[in-house]
Amino acid sequence: MFRMRLNAEQVGRKFEVSDDELTVVARRMSDAMDAGLWRNEQPGALATIRCWDTRVPRLSPPAVTDAVVPKFLSLDLCHSDRFCTRFTTIMLNAHDEVRTRSREHSLTPSTLMTGKVANLFDHVASGLAEFADEFHMRRVGLPLALTLGFPVWHAGALGGEASLCRWTKGFGCADTMSGDVAAEFRVAAARADVVVGPVAVFNDACVAMMHGAADRSDTRVALVVDDGCNCCYVSEFGRTVINTEWGAFGEDGALDHLLTKYDRQLDVRSQNPSKQIYEKMTSGMYMTELVREAVLEIASNQAMFEGRTTNAMKTEYAIKAKHLWIVESDRSRSHSAVRTVLTEVLDVTDPSDMDCELFRYVCRCITKRSANLIAAGLSVVLRRTGFPVTVVIDGSAFKTHSEYALMVGSKARQLTPHQTKFTLRTVDRTRGQDSRIVARVLASIPASGGAR
C-alpha cells in the first residue's frame, strides 16, 4: 500500500508549481501581453498573446431608452463534453423580462470538426433550420448573435466584421475562413433556406463580460475556463475590451520549464501541436486527458487497480471534464462518485478504496496546477486594472467544480499586490439586462449591412 501511494505521489509531484515559478510565469505573461498590445500598433511585431482591442457598447446596465432589438436568435457553437450547437430565441420587454426557447443540435460525426469549414457551417445551419421550423421562424429574418469559443479578431466595433483566426479545443478544420465569419454564416443559412437578419459575432469571454457588466458596473475582467480558457479586461481608458486570447501563451517556450512528459505527449497527439500551450495546461478538455495518461502509467506500474488496465484507459479523451469535477467534489467516505466514474467511464472492476483515493489525488494535482496557472495569469491582468474590480467568472470549471474558484482566488491574491482589491463573481444568466446589452449591439448594425 505504501508503494502504491509513493508511486502516485511521484507522478503527482510532477504537476507541482512553486510560488517562485508562478511569479516567473506571471512576469513572462506580462511581457507577452505587452508584446501583444504593441503588435496592435506595429502589425509586423511578433506576439504569442494577441491582446486584440474590441470596441464594445457601454459596459453598464443598459437604460430602458436604449435602442434594442426586441427579439433575436442566439447561436452558441460549443464543445463542453458534448459536441453541439445551442440555439436560443430571446424575447425582451421594457422591464428586461426575458422569455427563451432553446434547443441543442449535435455536431456528430466528429469529422465535422476536422473537415471543411463549409461542411461545419452547413451542418450548423441545418440545425438552425430545424429550430426555425419548430418555432415557425424560417422566413422571419431575426437578428443573430453568434458566439464562438475560438480566437476572433474584430475589425472595429463589436457587431462589425469579425475574422476567425484559429481553430482550438479539438476543432481543426482543414481550411480557414477567408473573411467575415458573419457573412460566411449568412451564406450557409441561405443554403439551408433560412433567412437571418444582421449577424454579430461574439467571443465567449466578451459575452461573459457583458453578463457581468449588466449586473455590476465595476466589472472590468472576465475569465473563462471551460474546454478552453480565455480572459478579457476593460482597457485603462474604458473605451475598449482587450481580448487577450491567452490560451496561446507558451508557444514561444515560455512554459517549457513546467511541461511534464504527459503535457508533451498530449501536445504531440493534439489537433494543433505546439499551439495553445497554456490552454493545454489549464482547460478542462486537456486536464482530463492528462489525468488519463497519468493514471494509465500508475496502473501499468502495478500501483493502481492491481495493475489492470482497460481499453477505456487507453482511449483518448475517454474522461470528460464533468467527470473530473465530479471526482474532485466527492467528499464521501464511500467514494461513491469516484467509484462511479472509475467503473462507468474507465471500466474498472470493483475499485478499492485506495484506488479511489489515488485517482482523486491525481485529479487534484492536475486541477490545482490549472488553478495556480490561471491565478498567475489573472494576477497580471489585475495589475493592469489599478483599482478595485469585479472579475466575472464563467465556464464549467467555475460552475461545476466545488473549489476551483476558491483556489484561483486564493492564489491570485498571493500573487497580486495587496492594494489591488478584486471580487470573483459567477455569471448570472437569469437576468434580462445582459440580453439587453446583446440586443443593443444587434440594433447598432445597419440594416443595409446585412452581411455583417
Regions inferred by a protein language model and the residue ranges of each:
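Short, glycine-/Ser/Thr-/acidic-enriched flexible segments
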Residues: 228-229, 249, 292, 398
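Alpha-helical segment proximal to the catalytic Tyr-Lys
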Residues: 219-220, 232, 238-277, 281
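Glycine-rich phosphate-binding loop and adjoining helix at the ATP-binding site
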Residues: 103-125, 129, 152-214, 221, ...
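Short, internal active-site loops enriched in acidic
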Residues: 148-154, 205-208, 396-399, 429-431
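Short beta-strand scaffold segments in enzyme catalytic cores
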Residues: 83-91, 207-211, 222-223, 229-235
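Short beta-strand segments
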Residues: 76, 145-149, 202, 222-228, ...
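ATP-binding/phosphotransfer module of carbohydrate and carboxylate kinases, centering on a glycine-rich
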Residues: 1-142, 214-215, 264-452
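Short, glycine/charge-rich beta-strand/loop segments that flank catalytic centers
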Residues: 48-51, 142-150, 200-207
